[in-house]
């Protein structure tokens, strides 16, 4: 079940030792073994006491082995160790395999030099809660293979073992669901060595999830119909005298424990009326007392023999067709969210933070591909795969919850330097995706529950009819906001609440009139303040790509007055501004449609960079030309910055490829791997492509270092001739990247280790695609067209 470390044994010939070797005195046995092994070994630091039927070790025995560094007591019958065992101050390796320990002896935590501990094939259920400073700083390898560990909750103290690198948990009874959660939180492809994966992954998961959820006890449907409440005792057993009580109403519950304490009369509302049940003088409640009333006897008997519905875990059935439609809606939401978050992560300057999001996105991509395959199978085959669909959707939703948590935790790192237009688009994409999730939930939910949610938001929603809890984002403020409730999975909130935060409704967010006219006073989104930081609040009179020449002045006027005048005066002021804008537009010449389209497209390209591009006003030919130049200049800056990121990513991929190719060469030299006639030329082609990429990276990086500052030194590279040279270098660089991706994919089938590069290769492919889009919008495209056109 769990990845294991390699077997460690102190004696390779131990299997040939007699299994029935016995000794009545452990001291005599230890002395004789010491004498025997001292003759064969000059060091005297290694002692093997294997399969000697030792049942206990005395303080006297410890005195004989005080200088031992490696000790093996495997295949004995030990159940405890003496307190004097801590006197083994040099002990570094201890093998207690195949003994009878039911818990880890506390005295082992007091061994000052112990680094490797093998406790496999015992009956241990948990790690000790208290970990000494010796273990915190020294323990590197711990084997609990073939024990009685039933949950990773029992290993919570593993988070204190700072040096632990290898943890063996194979052949325990840990639920697969818990291991899946650990693997989902820390995927295998995060660069962790396989033998160290479980030690790091479980420790990381337990650190970030200190309070793991405890499964709720299941209640039988018959008990629910009869109005009884089942509660398990601490040991999991069911006691009829403690667990049966009558549920009086929807708001109150009379439990058995309350009836045991109180000697007063308790009023209980039944299905047909109200009765008073008096507890006995001793306070004990008899579980059968309820049936002594003939009024209820026949009724409850009839309820108790009603047939149970043939459903697993009490879930309500939905048709396969409904489930498929809902999964398609969720697939759309997953895809949109993934693309939006990927762009946000690509802009993050803190790569150590961004790599966590990228890792989760890669996991989402993998599960999404699996979801698409399962949906295709359901369409092409007669068999249904409902459980697989549900499991994949829940796994992806869990990953998105973790991603949103990371975005909220590092909010400023991801969003502080981003352009406002892009943040608005990102927010809108998430809102639309959540709305589609709500549509999927509504589609498979019962009609009465869906209609009831219009008047009162339910506490729990689910994507299938399972009892998967989720919270809702409710709209607030204003009549329009109260008409729609937007629900999302889990406690996911993109933006932290502040005094000026107000969650917009779907109608307010999707209002075309507000967006097109620039009047976004009803849309609370992010807006930059005077210091460049982001605050939450409404955007007043935002200037967009189709505003006229006076819009810049109007926006400044509104910003100046919005903090000093009342709301009614502000509305009148906005109305007068709108009238003046219409009057000025009536006397202005009609704008050229091509120019308008190009500027709108240029402004929309903000989603691939964090450089602010403000669409300029268009009042005439000269103004249009100057504004077009400004847009091109800003797009060029975007291009330089994105290319700089690509150069760094190519360097990372190059180093990884070089490392793997070197390993292949070394393995081939040592005879561990044979280079076939087909593999050798593939590796040569890949090596040559990487060399070309690094040469072009060097040339391009030299130019980018001069162009990015955008000062007087960059002018020498802004002539038509130099721009054409830069264009050719960029094109060659992008072609080489495509060749690297293609050649690496070809070699992957023969060299499986290259699969570890997939996340970085995927990111490189995506950002390269973004570069091609920006390159077509930049001024370099026009230079290349003019150079290639016939005179």
UniProtKB/Swiss-Prot annotation:
Its main location: cytoplasm. Residues 469-486 have a biased composition (Low complexity). Residues 8-19 have a biased composition (Basic and acidic residues). It is found in: Cytoplasm. The modification Phosphothreonine is found at residue 214. This is Leucine-rich repeat-containing protein SOG2. LRR repeats lie at residues 43-64, 67-88, 90-111, 113-134, 138-159, 163-183. It comes from Saccharomyces cerevisiae (strain ATCC 204508 / S288c). GO terms for biological process: budding cell apical bud growth; septum digestion after cytokinesis; signal transduction.
